[in-house]
Amino acid sequence: MRHAEVSYVDSAGAPVKPEEVPLTAAGREQAAAARDALAGVELDLVVASDLPRTAETAAIVAPGHEVERWPELAEWRGGRLDAIPPDELETSFVGALQVKDEAQRFLGGESLGEALDRVHPALERLLARAWHTALAVLHGGVNRIVISYALSGDRTYFGTFEQAPACLNILDLGEDGWIVRTVNYVPYEPLHPARTTTMEHLWEQLKPFLDERQ
C-alpha cells in the first residue's frame, strides 16, 4: 500500500523536507480506513521504508505488529526544482512518475534505472523471506516499480496508473508467477471521485510558493 496523506508544505505554503513530514489528520483517518479494510487479514510480516510517513501509516494499519524499516524502499529521490527551467517545471513535475527511459531522472534527481537498481534487489530479498501474507507500506513511485515488476517480470516500468494516499494493492506470488489482483483500491473513496493525480495535487500546493519565488 501507499502511505496515507501528508502535506509537503507548511501553514505558510512553503515546502518542507519530504523526509520528515508526518501524516495529516486526514491521513490518519485514511490509514484507519485501510486498517478496517484489512481487519480480517492475518499478517505475518509488516515492512515500511525508513521514512516517517510510511512507518506511521504502518503503525495505524497494523497495530501490534513490529514494523521493519527498509531504507532501500524509500521514495524516488528528487533533485532541486530551481534547476528545472521555469517554462518546463509544471510539465516536468506533474509527469515526474510517468518516465519511460531508465536514464530519465525524477525531478532532476534519481534516475529510473537507479531506482530500479535499488528497489528490485530489496523486493527479491523480501520475497526470499518465509511468510504467507505481508504488508508493505511504501510510496507511489516505489509501488509503481513493484507492480510493474509483477506485471512484466523484468525492468519494464509502467508509470501511468495512480497510487492514491493509503491505497491498497493486492499481489499474489505462486509457483506459476505473479497475479495482480487489485491496484489502487482506496477504502475511504472506492469510486475515486478526485480527478487529479497525486502529483497534480502536490503541484497545486507548491505552485503559489514557486510563483512568488520567480
Model-predicted regions and their roles:
Residues 76-87, 149-214:
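Acidic, low-complexity terminal tails and accessory targeting/binding regions
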Residues 55, 63, 121-179:
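Active-site-adjacent alpha-helix immediately C-terminal to a catalytic or transition-state-stabilizing loop
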Residues 32-98:
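Phosphate-coordination/substrate-recognition cap region in phosphate-metabolizing enzymes
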Residues 2-57, 61, 105-120:
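Loop-to-helix element that buttresses phosphate recognition and phosphoryl-transfer chemistry
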Residues 93-114, 204-213:
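Short glycine/proline- and acidic residue-enriched helix-loop micro-motifs
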